[in-house]
Structure formats: structure tokens, C-alpha cells
Amino acid sequence: MVKMSHGPRSGSRRKLTKSAEERKRSVIGRFMQEFEPGDRVAIDIEPSVHAGMPYHRFQGYTGVVEGPQGDCYKVAVKIDSLTKYVIASPVHLKKIKG
């Protein structure tokens, strides 16, 4: 028997797979996004970009940008009564209107 992998991407095949339509789109514009502290964002992981990728558990969560951290942004995500901080590149974030 082969030992099961316990790496950071294990168990994420469906979350980190793009459809044929998504593979055609360029992500260059998403690299150029800028956020201000207090902006609400959704974590939408771009599987083709590994730099600044948050852990796949946070795929689909929403949070508030705390501020920049290097080339990435620190995002406060509230899960039940806990506040977790995710550091993600702008290509993995989408601004929420409102």
C-alpha cells in the first residue's frame, strides 16, 4: 500500500480545477487589483497561480481587508466566533460590491 499524501493541496482536486471556459480567460487583470483597508472581498483561488495562494479551506469565504502585507493582502475572515487571518495575493481575491 502507498501512504496517503498529507500535503497542503491534498483533497482539493475539485476546488482547484478550472473548467474549459475558465482556462481560456487571462488572469493578468486580476494581478493588478488594488484594495483598501476595510474593503470586503471574497476568496476565489486561482489554481494556475501558486504564489500567494491561501489554503484551500478558505475557498469561497468572505472577509475584510486589513491592509497590505508585502505584495499580498491580509484578510480577516470570520468563522463562527473566531477571526482568522489569511494572507493572499490579489489574484486570489474578488471585491464585493456594497
Swiss-Prot record:
A GO molecular function held by the record: structural constituent of ribosome
User: Which cysteines form disulfides?
Assistant: none
Q: Does the keyword Nucleotidyltransferase apply?
A: no
The organism's superkingdom is given as Archaea
Q: What PROSITE patterns is this protein classified in?
A: RIBOSOMAL_L21E
- What InterPro entries does the entry give? Ribosomal_eL21, Ribosomal_eL21_arc, Ribosomal_eL21_CS, Ribosomal_eL21_sf, Translation_prot_SH3-like_sf
List the residue ranges of the region (Disordered): 1-24
Matching Pfam families? Ribosomal_L21e
Entries under SUPFAM superfamilies matching the protein? Translation proteins SH3-like domain
**Keyword Ribonucleoprotein part of the UniProt annotation:** yes
Q: Which GO terms describe its cellular component?
A: ribonucleoprotein complex; ribosome
What protein family does this chain belong to?
Belongs to the eukaryotic ribosomal protein eL21 family.
The name this protein carries in UniProt is Large ribosomal subunit protein eL21
